[in-house]
Amino acid sequence: MKAAVDHYEELIKILKDPEEAAAYLNAALEAGDERAFLLALKNVLAAQGGMTKISDRTKINRVSLYKMLSKNGNPGFKNILLLLKISGIHFRAIPRGTKTKTRLSHRS
């Protein structure tokens, strides 16, 4: 019998790749749901070593990071840009209709 797959752990492995992380965040942005984007960003940060490591790198208190990325969180744009930068993701505006990679790769 095949062991059950821990989907969260598999997602975190995939999100360690900056291109996959960017595609994941783009998909969340395109969905137009702020909560979905914050959850996606939280998952990308988890793939980068977790909130303690991110807190050390950003000098933002770990508890504050959890609050700003919670379902009721409201991080400022400056903090979002900082968290993206720490994750190796560059934020830019592109014209509507431009194709972007929005799928995670399928791994076997």
Model feature map: region roles:
Residues 1-43, 100-107:
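N-terminal flexible/basic segments that precede or flank functional cores
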Residues 68, 96-97:
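Residue-level "edge-of-site" marker
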Residues 59-75:
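Recognition helix of helix-turn-helix/homeodomain-like DNA-binding domains
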